[in-house]
Structure formats: structure tokens, C-alpha cells
Amino acid sequence: MLFRSLSTDLKDAVLTALKGKIDGGGAAGSVKIYTGTKPAGPAVAITSQVLLGTLVLSYPCGAVADGALTFSPITQDSSADATGTATWARIFDSAGVAKIDVDASVVGGPGFMQMNTTSVIINGPILINSCVITA
């Protein structure tokens, strides 16, 4: 996010609003992981990016503190839909409405979403180790 000069309490307010939108459907949201270039935003349609798999968020999805939304454990996808390199993910509410796109990387990499591996094999598991969105 681009809110680097905001106070921590204001960052927390922005992220609490995001968390509220993800949890707003009254049930668990989801994360869809894709290959390719991340679109300009969650309202932009998927084009050539390949859907690798879908994972289910916890409900509520996480907690906000100190300018970060830290997601609770995310249920793995036990059978990937396709083979490819995970580069980004789109997070949805329980009604399937896209809320935010985030970069993916291996643990220790620069992505908000950290995976044990970004190399996904069809029918293999997809695991998100952590997802922390900072403002």
C-alpha cells in the first residue's frame, strides 16, 4: 500500500476496514493464486494469468496491529489446478468479490504472501506460510 507517511493508528484503521470487507460476507473468504503479471487492481479482469489454485481463509481472516494485517492460518489447496510459478494472489470475500491483489514470494522474499515454494505442480498441494499486508 502507499500509506507510508500515515500514523500507525490511521494505518490500523485502513487495514481494519480491509479486514472488515474481507470478512464482511459473514463467512470465510478465499485466496486465488496466479501466474504472470499482477493486474492494476482487483477490479481489473484476469487475462493471460493462469489460476494455480484456490485456498480458504480463516474466519475472521486475521488481526490488525501496528500497521499490519496478519492473516490467520490459511487452509492449503490439496490439489493445484495447474502447473506454473505463483507470482501474485487475489483475495476475495465469502461472496467472491475481489478485495485486494498481493505479490507472492517464497518465505523470506519480498511478497506480502509468503509460500513454501512458488513452483506449483498440477494436483500437488499449495501452501501459504504467511500473509501480512502492511500499510
Q: Can you annotate each of these PLM segments?
A:
Residues F3-T87, D93-A135:
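Small cysteine-rich, disulfide-bonded extracellular modules of the LU/uPAR three-finger superfamily
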